[in-house]
Amino acid sequence: MTLKDYDLELFNAIQREDNRQKEHIELIASENFVSDAVLEAQGSILTNKYAEGYPNKRYYGGCEFVDQVEILAQDRLKQIFNAKFVNVQPHSGSQANAAVYQALLSPGDRVLGMDLNAGGHLTHGYKLSFSGHYYEAHAYGVSRFDERIDYEEVLKIAIEVKPKMIIAGASAYPRVIDFKKFREIADTVGAYLFVDMAHIAGLVACGLHPSPLPYADVVTSTTHKTLRGPRGGIILTNDASIAKKIDRAVFPGQQGGPLMHIIAAKAVAFKEALDPNFKVYQTQVIKNAKALSDTFKSLGYKLISDGTDNHLILVDVKSKLGITGRDAEDALYKANITINKNQLPFDQEKPMLTSGIRLGTPAMTTKGFKENEFIKVAQLIDEVLSNINNEEVINKVKKEVLKLMKDVK
């Protein structure tokens, strides 16, 4: 029996989401559209199989074929990032990060990560996250002068704090991160260097952002976002002793049975990332972000760090228009443009209001948008934000969005 026949209520909810994805311009930087092959693997009968443990070391019988699946994912991931040891089992990026903490630290140990307001992530030491609850978390930020990481300041804080682990990586930082400098800082204070490359993994895979692997003790990522795979996490290292600790921290430390259907989908995405066309795609992602950035600047908006090196931009809507990020998000959604409000460095607004918005290009680049389309998108966004209480203007923009979306993949 089909889902439609058995559960029409759920089927209709999925169909409505399908329509939303087809009719909205998707600019959330952490989202993307997976291939049909990834979807096929994710919806496969592998969801039926329990496989606690690792290939050739399972706690259940009948795992010979899921072993093949996981080994494929491991081998492809190693090839992409030139890593000696990988773990493809984490259910999410946050669980991958939690496994790193468990593997390398004890509760109460000091960590130094990027402040959430400056572009960091909840798992980098935020007080309401496990990372700030079980560990003594300290933070570095960005310079007030250029809104970029001030590595001298990071060093100064590290010397003062003496963390056991330093975390590099971000969820809202539009510039290249210098992992070599972070390695030097970590070595100065005798700390582990942990890099969370979730947002930039696809760029790193193609050599469009420096790789953290030569410098970090351990690296994590999500498999969605720029990697364009299923929702999930991965962990990579070149250190054999750390790899053993990581494996124990993932299973049985953080998780029980792995999601074999998701691991299969990861394997598909990793094969796609090894295809030469993937670099063409990632190159276009960056070109599109620069087109978006340049257009917003020409329209008089302040951009955090004055631009971008990667797949995202942070736009200050408060300084130009006097509106909050939430105002912007709500108005744009009425026009079928999906974005997220985002705190900016040194933001005076509350986290649920914010002074800015975060825009990313990966999803619509997958749909075939290039520079001209993103220039148009920036203009449409400006039209809405300059008229957030004008329903006539918003409806006009919505019609233009629907017209644009009719021509995409």
UniProtKB/Swiss-Prot annotation:
Gene3D superfamilies assigned to the protein according to its UniProt record, in alphabetical order = Aspartate Aminotransferase, domain 1, Type I PLP-dependent aspartate aminotransferase-like (Major domain)
Q: In which pathway does it act?
A: One-carbon metabolism; tetrahydrofolate interconversion; Amino-acid biosynthesis; glycine biosynthesis; glycine from L-serine: step 1/1
Q: Does the keyword Ligase apply?
A: no
Q: Which UniProt keywords apply?
A: Amino-acid biosynthesis, Cytoplasm, One-carbon metabolism, Pyridoxal phosphate, Transferase
Supply one GO BP term: glycine biosynthetic process from serine
Q: Does the keyword Transcription apply?
A: no
The site annotation (Plays an important role in substrate specificity) covers 224
UniProt subcellular location? Cytoplasm
Residues modified to N6-(pyridoxal phosphate)lysine? 225
Q: Which NCBIfam families match?
A: PRK00011.1
Give the UniProt family note.
Answer: Belongs to the SHMT family.
Job of this protein: Catalyzes the reversible interconversion of serine and glycine with tetrahydrofolate (THF) serving as the one-carbon carrier. This reaction serves as the major source of one-carbon groups required for the biosynthesis of purines, thymidylate, methionine, and other important biomolecules. Also exhibits THF-independent aldolase activity toward beta-hydroxyamino acids, producing glycine and aldehydes, via a retro-aldol mechanism.
In Swiss-Prot or TrEMBL terms, this protein is called Serine hydroxymethyltransferase
Organism in which the protein naturally occurs: Acholeplasma laidlawii (strain PG-8A)
